[in-house]
Amino acid sequence: MIIRFEEKLSVENAQLVCQWSNSLGKSFQEQWMGPMIPFPLTIQVLQDLEGIFSIFEGQEFVGLIQKIRQEDSNRHIGRFFINPQKQGQGLGRQALRKFVSLVFENRDIDSISLNVFEANQRAQNLYQKEGFEIVQMVEAPVRKYIMKKSR
């Protein structure tokens, strides 16, 4: 399994992400995009995101992930989404592991953080297996955890 990243998201791949996400409904979209992005998801919204990376397995587009912001020596990532038909095959684990390595290539970054909703147990398990630890719980509007991994 060869995972690679490309900066940005093509129109064709943005269309695929919209199809995958919109077919799973508004509450699903809020879990991976956050509550500020209107439903249904559109190509334009995806293409306007800064720091977005397309994830490929070989030549096949399989998902995306975003470098959201940098706070001092911490890089916050999110909007990590793998094609639902490809989930459960280890792609997410491989992609996350490789993306974390890519982020840590920047020597100014000492830690990586992300948010995960309490109800998203599958994602929490993945993040914990990859060395992320819960550092904070946020209650409003829905309980979520801030998880962090240090170098």
Identify the function of each model-found stretch.
Residues 3-85, 96, 102, 106, ...:
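Acetyl-CoA-dependent GNAT
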Residues 90, 107-108, 131:
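Short glycine-rich hinge loops at helix-strand junctions in the catalytic core
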Residues 83-85, 89, 118-119:
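Active-site acidic-Proline motif in GNAT/NAT acetyltransferases
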